[in-house]
Amino acid sequence: MKLLRYGPPGQEKPGILDADGRIRDLSAHVPDLAGDVLSDAGLARLRALDPATLPLVSGEPRIGACVGRVGKFIGIGLNYADHAAEAGMPVPKEPVVFGKWTSSICGPNDGIDIPKGSVKTDWEVELGVVIGAPCKDVDEARALDYVAGYCVVNDVSEREWQIERGGQWDKGKGFDTFGPIGPWLVTRDEVPDPQSLDLWLEVDGHRYQNGNTRTMVFTVAQLIAYLSSCMTLQPGDVITTGTPPGVGMGIKPAPVYLKAGQMVRLGIEGLGEQLQLTRAAR
């Protein structure tokens, strides 16, 4: 299934894509795509519905983040060896974990606000993993059983705040609008191997990132097992799993960063695309 949330910010309704790619309303069956709705049992109930019998959503509504009430938004850094090299950092021996504030979350096609005074706002296309059941101390072999589904994430980052101003990644990753998620939550049954997905990103039509999740340093299963060893993962938690090479700060001979008025387009095979206009923060 391809699940989504649509409507104005803060008033999103749950929906599902039908066989023709049209949005069908799920709000008579679930209040939101959050919590227990993301469990195996909750998703099975949605899967049993015939989308053709659900109300058709007219027009072209705004698409919100594909998960509601996110509890934890967990980032993984330097999880592609070639990205670590372009950043001038060693390949980590353990996952690099940081937090993105949930207030950074926005819809996949909402604008990206360039922070006041920023000259180093950067892009990162990433595979997002949405947890569907509580998990603590799970082993790698069973880790994917706790996944509700997968989505596209743009881990927007302000490099000066992240690296130069005290080296605190949470600061540089957590500005408002720095966490576009979606358009869809694609349930795990439709993603048989999360380690074989092409992902890409363009700015103003120029392709900067072109990678595949097979080159991750730590797989999705390894990340879930690792994270669950130090925290309880809950339904609706989102893990964004790192980015392939081609970020702005790694461009040679000189870095390239986002400015107001640019179009960022990104996507992952089978998970949909995002399109964002950058704008100056007010």
Swiss-Prot record:
GO MF assignments: hydrolase activity; metal ion binding; ureidoglycolate lyase activity
UniProt entry tagged with the keyword Transmembrane helix: no
Disulphide linkage map: none
EC class name: hydrolase
Chain positions recorded as Mg(2+) binding sites: E124, E126, D155
A Pfam family the protein falls into: FAA_hydrolase
Record keyword Magnesium present: yes
Family, similarity comment: Belongs to the FAH family.
GO-annotated biological processes: urate catabolic process
Protein name: Putative hydrolase Bmul_3283/BMULJ_05242
E.C. code: 3.-.-.-
Key words of the record: Hydrolase, Magnesium, Metal-binding
Gene3D superfamilies: Fumarylacetoacetase-like, C-terminal domain (3.90.850.10)
Protein source organism: Burkholderia multivorans (strain ATCC 17616 / 249)
Cofactor needs: Mg(2+)
